[in-house]
Regions:
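Nucleotide/phosphate-binding sheet-loop regions of phosphoryl- and nucleotidyl-transfer enzymes
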Residues: 1-274
């Protein structure tokens, strides 16, 4: 029951913001006020009853802002979501991005409609993002973070402190939180296999999103990962050495404009520090 109402309030919040245009902060204020009133510090502290109350408050807020109730018909909800994706092609942020990257406006965008898996079905479920190599340094080491009993938005929204993916990351970041390698060793092993397969297939460093639903791993997305200029050089050289790409391909992957990043003083990552 808790999972159902947690998922429902997430849907109302995201649909209300993205499709109906009710600003995100309206929902966050309702949630924050409820947590303060009941002495909760984390979203995971809330019960099924709490989420039921919040879902009703979210719907009431939508009706107050729009003058009409939150749509309950699944077909109306689906077409609203599809229309919102098509409409996003012409928002200001998308226009600026296309201009910066020389992407033609007439290309348009596509919509995928697919069933969803849930990372918030208890402590056998999780969600996370990861890179097949370190996007900051280019080191050939699995890199990423995840959250138990959460959905993908929680990882990027900063609502909860994410946990490291690997024990090496945990030690490097001096984290007190358990790594996925510790708490879900079998799933972590599957993820490592996927990491190798995808990088060998695409022949580039991959940025991946995943969900674990009741101890089953689901891959949601993969794409070529963004990286620093330093990482770009290291990844290109090492992939050529590994035989994944040719030396000619490695040279073509280096953006000449990125050379400027390497000509400035940088902090030594191994220097002693105090925080």
């Amino acid at each position: 029951e808790r999972f159902a109402y947690d998922s429902y309030r997430r849907f109302i919040q995201m649909y209300g913001d993205v499709v109906l245009g009710v600003e995100h902060h309206n929902f966050e204020t309702i949630l924050a006020d409820h947590k303060d009133e009941h002495g909760y510090s984390l979203d995971t502290d809330l019960t099924a009853t709490d989420w039921k109350i919040i879902a009703s408050a979210f719907k009431a807020k939508v009706e107050k802002e729009l003058g009409e109730p939150f749509p309950l018909d699944p077909h109306e909800q689906l077409w609203g979501a599809v229309s919102a994706v098509f409409g996003s092609w012409m928002n200001d942020r998308a226009k600026i991005y296309r201009r910066l990257h020389d992407i033609p406006e007439e290309w348009g965008t596509a919509v995928n409609v697919q069933s969803m898996v849930f990372g918030n079905m208890g402590n056998t479920s999780a969600t996370g993002v990861c890179f097949t190599r370190n996007p900051s340094t280019g080191e050939n080491a699995f890199y990423g973070e995840f959250l138990l009993n959460a959905q993908g938005e929680d990882v990027v929204a900063g609502i909860r402190t994410p946990q490291p993916l690997t024990l090496a990351e945990k030690d490097l970041g001096h984290s007190d939180l358990p790594a996925m390698e510790e708490v879900m060793p079998e799933i972590f092993g599957e993820l490592c296999d996927v990491r190798e397969k995808l990088e060998n297939h695409y022949k580039d460093m991959q940025d991946m999103e995943f969900t674990v639903q009741q101890n089953k791993l689901w891959m949601l997305q993969t794409r070529n990962g963004k990286r620093t200029a330093k990482a770009s050089f290291k990844i290109a050289v090492e992939m050529a050495d590994e035989g994944l790409i040719t030396k000619e391909e490695a040279i073509k992957r280096i953006d000449p404009a990125a050379l400027d990043q390497l000509l400035h003083p940088t902090l030594d990552p191994n220097a002693p520090r105090s925080v």
